[in-house]
């Protein structure tokens, strides 16, 4: 579960990580009643990356500018997401920008701290151009993470002595958040040093493990409250080809096919075993909510999932969205009946998933 920036920063504050002074503005608020008498940053609260480049961060120096910029944000979409809330922060006098994150390294099966003196830019870009500016440290979860480890990381990055204690303290507290809240990712980019020598988390990214919800009170978070109770596993991604399968392995293999054909999956959607026509309809409608989707790759190996039920669901949704590009690969239980249903409605199908993927990409 992804948290909005303002939610993540509220948690940072509770753990003693400095954040800029701020207030939250909602679409329903009366902007004229808000007094702004200094330079501020208006940050659209949307759960997408690259918000700044997409026009989701604006600046204002007085009330008139603030109202104008806030209205501009509320009336636009940032990478397909409507802006319902804006975090308004004091504009910091930034001297330096650093990067710090903690993620799960699935190869090493350990949490990984990543620190760089190159903040404010994509860490992938730094890794490609200046890999020597990235410090990595794998955490042994069987041992306590002590403050001296955070200091070692910062010293390895060759920070000035007057910054070591402050930055190390942020890293130490960041891992405390990561561990205590069952996070899968926590990131500050940039972690800034101001001209008066103070340190602030100028941005905040925090992803929590949905499977740990029973241990925490997630009800306070916006995405959890709004989360649909879907009868299938769904993860939205950055591509433009929706991938639907039955079974995690088959769905992942289908995503690999799309990647190998030069496109990126727009989602992972596993309808599971025994899905009926209604579940298939829900799945298709869900992926079509994503405005980036240009085509849908459906890969079904029927066991307890019946191909005729899948076909019925596809036909119903295609009536609602006749211009959507589909590719269907179906094999297994009631395969012949399912194929007949698709044929009657002019929907092509394949028995080879590679061929189905290739034909879909050719249409896009």
Curated annotation (Swiss-Prot):
GO terms for cellular component: succinate-CoA ligase complex. Signal peptide: none annotated. Substrate binds at residues 246, 303-305. One of its GO terms (molecular function) is succinate-CoA ligase (GDP-forming) activity. Gene3D superfamilies: ATP-grasp fold, A domain, ATP-grasp fold, B domain, Succinyl-CoA synthetase domains. ATP binds at residues 43, 50-52, 89, 92, 97. Its cofactor is Mg(2+). Residues 9-229 form the ATP-grasp domain. GO terms for biological process: succinyl-CoA metabolic process; tricarboxylic acid cycle. InterPro entries: ATP-grasp, ATP-grasp_succ-CoA_synth-type, ATP_grasp_subdomain_1, Succ-CoA_synthase_bsu_CS, SUCC_ACL_C, Succ_CoA_ligase-like_bsu, Succinyl-CoA_synth-like. Pathway: Carbohydrate metabolism; tricarboxylic acid cycle; succinate from succinyl-CoA (ligase route): step 1/1. Mg(2+) binds at residues 189, 203. Its EC number is 6.2.1.5. It catalyses: succinate + ATP + CoA = succinyl-CoA + ADP + phosphate; GTP + succinate + CoA = succinyl-CoA + GDP + phosphate. It is an enzyme of class 6 (ligase). Keywords: ATP-binding, Ligase, Magnesium, Metal-binding, Nucleotide-binding, Tricarboxylic acid cycle. Binds 1 Mg(2+) ion per subunit. Succinyl-CoA synthetase functions in the citric acid cycle (TCA), coupling the hydrolysis of succinyl-CoA to the synthesis of either ATP or GTP and thus represents the only step of substrate-level phosphorylation in the TCA. The beta subunit provides nucleotide specificity of the enzyme and binds the substrate succinate, while the binding sites for coenzyme A and phosphate are found in the alpha subunit. Belongs to the succinate/malate CoA ligase beta subunit family. Heterotetramer of two alpha and two beta subunits. This is Succinate--CoA ligase [ADP-forming] subunit beta. It comes from Methanocaldococcus jannaschii (strain ATCC 43067 / DSM 2661 / JAL-1 / JCM 10045 / NBRC 100440).
């Amino acid at each position: 579960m992804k948290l909005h920036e303002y939610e993540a920063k509220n948690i940072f504050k509770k753990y003693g990580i400095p954040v800029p002074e701020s207030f939250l503005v909602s679409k329903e608020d009366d902007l004229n009643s808000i007094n702004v008498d200094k330079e501020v940053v208006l940050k659209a609260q949307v759960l997408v990356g690259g918000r700044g480049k997409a026009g989701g961060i604006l600046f204002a120096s007085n009330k008139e500018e603030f109202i104008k910029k806030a209205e501009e944000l509320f009336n636009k979409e940032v990478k397909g997401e409507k802006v319902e809330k804006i975090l308004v922060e004091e504009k910091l006098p930034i001297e330096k920008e650093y990067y710090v994150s903690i993620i799960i390294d699935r190869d090493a099966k350990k949490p990984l701290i990543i620190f760089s003196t190159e903040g404010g830019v994509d860490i992938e870009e730094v890794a490609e151009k200046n890999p020597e500016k990235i410090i990595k440290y794998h955490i042994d979860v069987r041992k306590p993470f002590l403050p001296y480890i955070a200091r070692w990381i910062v010293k390895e990055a060759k920070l000035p002595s007057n910054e070591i204690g402050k930055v190390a303290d942020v890293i130490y507290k960041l891992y405390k958040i990561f561990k205590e809240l069952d996070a899968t990712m926590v990131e500050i980019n940039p972690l800034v040093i101001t001209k008066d020598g103070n340190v602030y988390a100028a941005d905040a990214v925090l992803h929590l493990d949905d499977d740990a919800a029973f241990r925490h009170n997630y009800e306070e978070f916006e995405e959890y409250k709004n989360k649909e109770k879907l009868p299938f596993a769904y993860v939205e991604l950055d591509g433009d080809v929706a991938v639907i399968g039955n079974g995690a392995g088959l769905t992942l293999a289908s995503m690999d096919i799309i990647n190998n054909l030069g496109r990126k999956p727009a989602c992972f959607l596993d309808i599971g075993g025994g899905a009926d026509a209604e579940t298939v309809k829900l799945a298709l409608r869900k992926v079509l909510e994503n405005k980036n989707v240009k085509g849908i790759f459906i890969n079904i190996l029927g066991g307890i999932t019946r191909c005729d039920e899948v076909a019925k669901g596809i036909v119903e949704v295609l009536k609602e969205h006749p211009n959507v590009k589909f590719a269907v690969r179906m094999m297994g239980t009631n395969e012949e009946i399912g194929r007949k249903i698709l044929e009657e409605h002019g929907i092509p199908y394949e028995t080879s998933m590679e061929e189905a993927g290739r034909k879909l990409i050719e249409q896009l």
